[in-house]
């Protein structure tokens, strides 16, 4: 395997686990223990799945407008290197992160989705395959810890905290 490019190494280095917890009775804190079942109306849980499916499809399509449309105006994104706050800064960061990738694939599986009124939390496992313009590839399995808000009748991402479960990188063989 070839050495990672600087950009890939930078991306990996910032994906350390970090989560900020907002006040709520929902159970998505780091102290979350055992109660990983789905809670709340099925229609809301389905709408949140569709929100994250839209997010992942936009990653695959590298469609910045579709991707950022999933976020609340005051959303927060944390890849382990600190909070990125507000849609403008989140989009700017995403464009920088995505710039070296020719192809991306992202697929997610919810561990649980819990809804309480107009707030929700979920944890997701993701499988990500990335191909750089250089031809090098990277595979990552990650975990998102999310918070959502219903805003004007639609679910939006309020906060996403990402951590890497494992990653591999190298040249296509």
Where are these regions (language model features)?
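Positively charged n-region of N-terminal signal peptides that target proteins for export
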Residues: 1-5
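Bacterial N-terminal signal peptides
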Residues: 8-20
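Short, low-complexity N-terminal intrinsically disordered segments enriched in polar/charged residues
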Residues: 25-61, 65-73, 89
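Short beta-strand edge/turn micro-motifs at domain boundaries
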Residues: 32, 121, 141-171
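A solvent-exposed, acidic/Ser-Thr-rich amphipathic alpha-helical stretch
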Residues: 51, 64-126
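Outer-membrane beta-barrel domain signature
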Residues: 71, 77, 166-169, 173
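Beta-strand elements of well-folded, non-transmembrane domains
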Residues: 128-132, 164-165
């Amino acid at each position: 395997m070839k050495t990672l490019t600087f950009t890939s190494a930078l991306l990996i280095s910032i994906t350390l686990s970090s989560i900020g917890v907002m006040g709520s009775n929902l159970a998505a804190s780091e102290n979350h223990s055992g109660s990983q079942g789905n809670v709340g109306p099925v229609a809301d849980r389905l709408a949140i799945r569709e929100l994250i499916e839209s997010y992942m499809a936009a990653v695959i399509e590298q469609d910045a407008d579709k991707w950022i449309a999933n976020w609340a105006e005051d959303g927060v994104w944390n890849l382990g290197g600190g909070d990125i706050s507000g849609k403008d800064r989140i989009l700017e960061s995403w464009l920088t992160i995505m710039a070296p990738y020719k192809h991306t694939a992202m697929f997610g599986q919810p561990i649980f989705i819990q809804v309480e009124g107009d707030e929700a939390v979920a944890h997701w496992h993701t499988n990500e395959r990335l191909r750089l313009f250089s031809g090098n590839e990277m595979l990552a399995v990650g975990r998102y810890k999310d918070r959502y808000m219903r805003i004007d009748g639609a679910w939006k991402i309020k906060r996403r905290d990402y951590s890497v479960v494992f990653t591999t990188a190298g040249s296509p063989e």
